[in-house]
Amino acid sequence: LPIFSNPELRFRAVVVSRRETNFDDTEEMFQKVYYQVFNNWLDRRDSYRLFIDRRIDERDRVDTLRRCLIDTFQFGNSVKFVEEVESHENDLIQLADLFIGALAASRNGHLQLEGSSAAKLQICRDICQNLNTSTLASYETWPSEQKFNVFHFRGRRNM
């Protein structure tokens, strides 16, 4: 998998359990989780170009996020732009989708179901081997992990 051999590639994922949060809707969850991710993970000395997978059903999503990250100056000049892209147009988003699918399948128990994708199972095994872990089902890291970071968000409704 290219992420493990390329020092410039990093993957960060946030796992959110609906049972452990109390958001009014998925849009509120998206905005608050993304804000916390960027607030805690962006190094303000670096510069970032953020690409968000386009969702047809949430038209204002990226504009709101852009206002929070760029227009408020809370992140200084570190966030250069936030752009919506179609995942099939961006190789890095496709790679992230692959990793997210592996994490979701592992955490939701789908890999144990009869008829599970052999390819997805192999990807999970490859990731586990590179991370030196036996499963992705409960895999979590500290925020300081640089290569393959998985954070379990345990938020409250009023942040």
Locations of regions flagged by a protein language model:
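Phosphate-ester processing/binding pockets and catalytic centers
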Residues: 1-159
